């Protein structure tokens, strides 16, 4: 097309290019022919229009949905194919053509699929709320993921899962339909394992999960109360086998992590940009902050790359004369440093091991799951940056008779995270890597083998902090089948959670690269001279220059002193769930289907916390309270709270075609004053 357009252009007398009217008209015609508008009508097998069918151009960006009459209109490229998808129907692909009529086929398997909802289950075909059922085998089973939260990334529409810090062992941040939080609250969804709230989705081994449902609308709050204001993630753990068999399964995976996007720092072009910006704004030379640059030093930086680029490694010591120069007022750098490479590994290993025992003997079924996760972090400079998790899960169920089934289970999770104590460093390790010019030495020692005052060095010097989270719960329950259509379920759960965090503040040391360097004096008290390659030479050598070095100092962050700190948190919680479900069918062909559910939920918690700190470490490499001689600070707290909720749900289906659902919860919390303690949560 470009060739045809250029042939229609003519050159004016002044040398300018002029496009003819014919060329312009032809170009418009080509653009108009690049897309076509396709209209169509979508029905079910009986010819009834389908509302809300998603129609997408295959391999393109155009997407529309059918209107109330099942009609759609979409603009696509000629000869495109259309992909149609709709819950309960088989996905369909057709060739795009004018005035289409498309008949979709029902997916019987999907329609009969059972989805876990609040205190019960529903056929997928009868869902009225915004519920997404996750394909666990596809999303979790085939991927080397550290936890279920990371496995849900990009899986559930309307749910965002991110790991803001990127640290191993950190909890993924899950947001459903928006980011707005309540005052002094959060906007995290309620996470439930077998109808019991758990503090973190990391406490569940992905290998122990049977199903995951995500509740996204107001119906979640109307069943689970105020805690579910931002949605609910319902996790159901694996139960025993349905047939007489005994299975032992061992799985493992070994993987390596790498940054999704390489962090590219500006090279010589960044220095050129700094110079040009200073010139354009009429600023005085030299440009830059702690490390300066002018035309002469820029030329030497270019020369340095030609001479030493690829030969001097990123972590080789910085050498005066070769890599930098001081004129008595300003420091000038020639060498570009790579703080990102010095701080971040190229690859970090990870391994997972899972053992499961599943079986059934008589009317008793059981499932036992054991898991181990070892994961290294990406911080190359740290002494330790890793995460280890142990998991154990047991579920046992036994049918006493046709009326009573009892069950018991237990869950144990131990998460241990080791990481550098960068919270006490002077310079934020990530901020300054981006903020500083690449002339600022990072990830190197000076030519005398001394540390420098910079983020990579501070991370390397920092002690290893430790965060350990332990969680244990045990549950007992029973199901009473009073009639074929009426059952009662009762579950009691006790859980215990502990958190221990150990941190320390140490004194750092390093050559001061921020400010004025000092003269390089030898052991005889004489000024040292160097040449342009950094070699020591006599003072009368041609090109010799007086040497300088970075003054070495010990320092603390934010005027603190060395210390060791410990934070300890303990929580005990008791949960009682009891609900009954009754199914009623009316009509000759049972075309009227009702389901009634009533229940109550009681949660009581008591917790205590302790924080201790002691200053003046005797041995900074071994931070312990017994090895500190300074002041001691202690604070502690204890509290309890309880929540009681009564809830109910009514479902009605007429011929499995017309559906109605209503939910209602009356919720009370001891956290509020008596006159504000109770409230209603309805949904229809």
Label each residue range with its predicted role.
Residues 237, 250, 355-359, 394-398, ...:
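Residues on the lipid-exposed face of transmembrane beta-strands in outer-membrane beta-barrel proteins
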Residues 147, 171, 230, 350-354, ...:
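Transmembrane beta-barrel architecture of outer-membrane proteins
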Residues 242-335, 373, 378-385, 391-471, ...:
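Surface-exposed loop/interface segments of Gram-negative outer-membrane beta-barrel transport/assembly proteins
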Residues 1-392, 405-407:
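Short, small/polar-rich motifs associated with maturation and membrane association
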